[in-house]
Swiss-Prot record:
Similarity comment: family membership: Belongs to the kinectin family.
Gene designation: KTN1
Lumenal domain ranges by topology: 30-1357
Protein's UniProt name: Kinectin
Role this protein plays: Receptor for kinesin thus involved in kinesin-driven vesicle motility. Accumulates in integrin-based adhesion complexes (IAC) upon integrin aggregation by fibronectin.
GO cellular component, one term: plasma membrane
Residues the record lists as Phosphothreonine modifications: 153
Transmembrane annotation, as ranges: 7-29
InterPro entries with a match to the protein in the record: Kinectin, Rib_rcpt_KP
Amino acid sequence: MEFYESAYFIVLIPSIVITVIFLFFWLFMKETLYDEVLAKQKREQKLIPTKTDKKKAEKKKNKKKEIQNGNLHESDSESVPRDFKLSDALAVEDDQVAPVPLNVVETSSSVRERKKKEKKQKPVLEEQVIKESDASKIPGKKVEPVPVTKQPTPPSEAAASKKKPGQKKSKNGSDDQDKKVETLMVPSKRQEALPLHQETKQESGSGKKKASSKKQKTENVFVDEPLIHATTYIPLMDNADSSPVVDKREVIDLLKPDQVEGIQKSGTKKLKTETDKENAEVKFKDFLLSLKTMMFSEDEALCVVDLLKEKSGVIQDALKKSSKGELTTLIHQLQEKDKLLAAVKEDAAATKDRCKQLTQEMMTEKERSNVVITRMKDRIGTLEKEHNVFQNKIHVSYQETQQMQMKFQQVREQMEAEIAHLKQENGILRDAVSNTTNQLESKQSAELNKLRQDYARLVNELTEKTGKLQQEEVQKKNAEQAATQLKVQLQEAERRWEEVQSYIRKRTAEHEAAQQDLQSKFVAKENEVQSLHSKLTDTLVSKQQLEQRLMQLMESEQKRVNKEESLQMQVQDILEQNEALKAQIQQFHSQIAAQTSASVLAEELHKVIAEKDKQIKQTEDSLASERDRLTSKEEELKDIQNMNFLLKAEVQKLQALANEQAAAAHELEKMQQSVYVKDDKIRLLEEQLQHEISNKMEEFKILNDQNKALKSEVQKLQTLVSEQPNKDVVEQMEKCIQEKDEKLKTVEELLETGLIQVATKEEELNAIRTENSSLTKEVQDLKAKQNDQVSFASLVEELKKVIHEKDGKIKSVEELLEAELLKVANKEKTVQDLKQEIKALKEEIGNVQLEKAQQLSITSKVQELQNLLKGKEEQMNTMKAVLEEKEKDLANTGKWLQDLQEENESLKAHVQEVAQHNLKEASSASQFEELEIVLKEKENELKRLEAMLKERESDLSSKTQLLQDVQDENKLFKSQIEQLKQQNYQQASSFPPHEELLKVISEREKEISGLWNELDSLKDAVEHQRKKNNDLREKNWEAMEALASTEKMLQDKVNKTSKERQQQVEAVELEAKEVLKKLFPKVSVPSNLSYGEWLHGFEKKAKECMAGTSGSEEVKVLEHKLKEADEMHTLLQLECEKYKSVLAETEGILQKLQRSVEQEENKWKVKVDESHKTIKQMQSSFTSSEQELERLRSENKDIENLRREREHLEMELEKAEMERSTYVTEVRELKDLLTELQKKLDDSYSEAVRQNEELNLLKAQLNETLTKLRTEQNERQKVAGDLHKAQQSLELIQSKIVKAAGDTTVIENSDVSPETESSEKETMSVSLNQTVTQLQQLLQAVNQQLTKEKEHYQVLE
């Protein structure tokens, strides 16, 4: 934690602020005490009573009067603050407050601020003091002026004691003392400084001089003591409020007469008192300085205050008297002090707020620091976890290194064991060499000739063998270079294949996305099949082209298969030849085993044959590697064939999709048929409704006819009633009928308003209303006819029956309407259910297709990944085989060096054995020649095999060309696939995207992008490993070159040693010839012969010479010769010893060579160990790369499955395109029909909704009419009850009419009643005509709608 974050800092800031405020107030209270004490002392020292002359006083008064008009306010305003300061000082002295140490001083900035505040406050106080002075409470304020000479300082400063009590200045030069004292005062009291000084300037009569003197004084204050800043103080003591005013007034009253007297006497005593004043000023200055520098305790300060009180006792009495008049000023001062306190409190509150803000900022910073700490802790935790993980990895790697070290130790132990075994063999060989040297010493003379011949022969053989070996090495290098070139070509082919695969994968991903879009959109929107059809025709052409190219590929593949079969036959022939050679070699082995005499040679030949076998095995391994490569190429071709087959399968799947689309079209046709059936049903319903409407119209016509008949009958009845006499009864009946008619009119008006809203069923209601009105009228008429008609009751009953029938008809119509509404609702429900079922079926179809596609993609991905795994495993096996071959080559080089050493040793042994077996040379030489012939035959076979290898390389190049052709064809296929994809994308763009499928596609795309990123990273890793492998290969090549250089060095050394030996043997032979010539000078043998032949001839001739010599001479000669022979023998022994030493030297040289070879072998073994280590590291890296490859394979399975799905979909698309070409026109027509049907269905659906709404309205209206009809039935029942009464009244009327048949009044009344009835009938006819016209209009509208719908359906048909 930092300092600002601690709780100590939070507590410390407010405590500091509080202490500063407390010190501020305390210093403010105690500031001016010490200054006031000094001022009092100075004033007491300088208060000298002076007497003023009357003339001077009068002049002073006159000048005072002159100046009062302009400068009164200035003098008074300056005197009031001085009085205030005196009162303050006296009040503090009375209360005996302890002085404050003078070392506490405020800064200049706080002093300036206080100056500004006090300058604002003091003008108000000055005005109040001026008003009080004008009231003439204190008569001694006005002092007569004294003439003053022009000096830079005023002559008298006695009035300055109001500001600083006790300070009084003389006329000459008391300004300096006054200035020094004023520096201790607050800078805000500049305006109050020295009012008496201003009065003296007023006496001189120049306002400008007064202003200049003020300026000089203020300047002197700031110049003399700029370092002392006195703090202002406003006393807050309540007890000290009354006494300061009184003391101030008394001091002013006492000072002014003294001042006048001093001014009057100053002129006469100026010269005498100058020295005294100067001495007093110096003493006072020293006193002030000592006071400034001193520190007072509380007791000392109290003593100083008591002394000042004693000296200012008289002044206090005068001030107490004048304290009453200055209460108002003190109140104002208190108010100002309260204001200052409030300002200070506000400052304190502001500081507190600032402290709070600082604490809040501290809290926020703490929170931030806590957040940072938590983040750092989390980071530390993650780093610790990573550290633990790294430690675990390091531990694992350390364990692995320990295991590797253990393995290396085991290998070293094995190598040391092998080295020990080799040393033992070398010791055995050395023993054998020593034995052979002993044998050579006994048989030198016999073996020298044979050694020469054999040596020359062996040298020739060595040269031939070395030449052959060099040729073989050159061939090996060429083969290795060819193999590297083939590897580079294979790597390039692999890269191209990977690029092709990546391109195919991308295209498969795109095609899968497009296919998914097609599936979803084909299911969702079948309206755009027309555009697809137009594009399918183009794709059919491309599909035909693809099929043609596939046929070409199949033909090329058949040719390639034939070539491969021929190559396999050749390989089989070569294998058979190798087996035959092996059989021959076995026979030779058996022959060699049978020959005991030439066992050593046979062993050597076995070694040579073993070497040749190794070379053959190496060639066979190279052939096997080439076979593996051919198999890999064949697998690649098989993969291409599989790709082609997959394309075909996809075409078949596309055809299946087309079949599914055809099935979907068939389902659409079924749906259309169902729609047609529903349309027929709707038509039937409409026809039924029309039929019903026509029936209702016929019934309406019949009712109109009945109305007409009833009207005629009513007229007849009216004529009959007109003949009857009873007027009153008729009038009552008419009134009842009118009331009923009015009621019926109201009901009819309500019904008319309802009938206006009803569409098709208003006709029946209007007919019923007309029937009701007619029946009521008939009832009214029949009441009049009861006298003449007996069967009126039966008519009424028939009418009731008719009414009941009409009611039943109305109910039946309502039931029919409800049934029709139910049917319509059921149909709508069925339509909606069918739509939902269609949607569900489409979704199920889409899900099934997606599941099938996923399953197919998964299977295809699994197969492709398996193929990739196989290919990669084969590649790894080939790499391992190459590494093993290189290791074998290194081992073979080491063995070859050992074999060369063994051959050298075996040649030595052979030379010794040839000397022993001179007799058996003929047979062994023949066998040797035969073996050489066999070796030559094998070398010829090797050459044949090399030729076969070259042919295989040419075949491989041709196959690579075929692969390139196939790749070009694949590129063409890909371009066609891209075209198809573009077409599919165009088709897909016409379909609206489905949200769910888009989400799935986006997720799959993300997964594919992630897989591609992983593939790229793994490819980078594989390339890195390849680079490492190439580096290792280069190192191996360098090692091989170093081995070859060492071999050449060794061969050169061997050749040099062999040449030296030949030279030594020739020298020995020459020396032997010279010795023999010296022994037998007579014998002469040609020198052209070989050494053995020359010795044989020389022996023969020497024997002949020896035989021709005589006895004694011969004996002497023989003795002489024996002596010479002994000498020669000694010489020969010496020479033999020399030769032995030479042989020993040669053996030492050979041993050195062996040691150097062994050292080099050890070095090479170390290098081999290092190479083994690197190989193991590479194997470990290969294992890691294999693991990564396995991961890649597991991840690439999905991609390959997607590719297969794409191919499958392409096949299906091609099939679909083939089949869609036939259905283009039909689909277009179906689309048009579907669009029209959809429009019609939408219109019919909207019309059905409208009809439902109208039916609902009709139901409501019917309910209203039913209620009205029920009320009417109740009224009819009442009317039926009234009919009986009417019948009785009619019988009475008839009886009365019979009595009064001759009255004329009845005729008049009868003339009036038909008129009323005719008016009523006219109104009824008008209303009926209106209803009829409305119904006709509605019928016309309905007919128009029906005609429109019929035309619409005809158009649809």
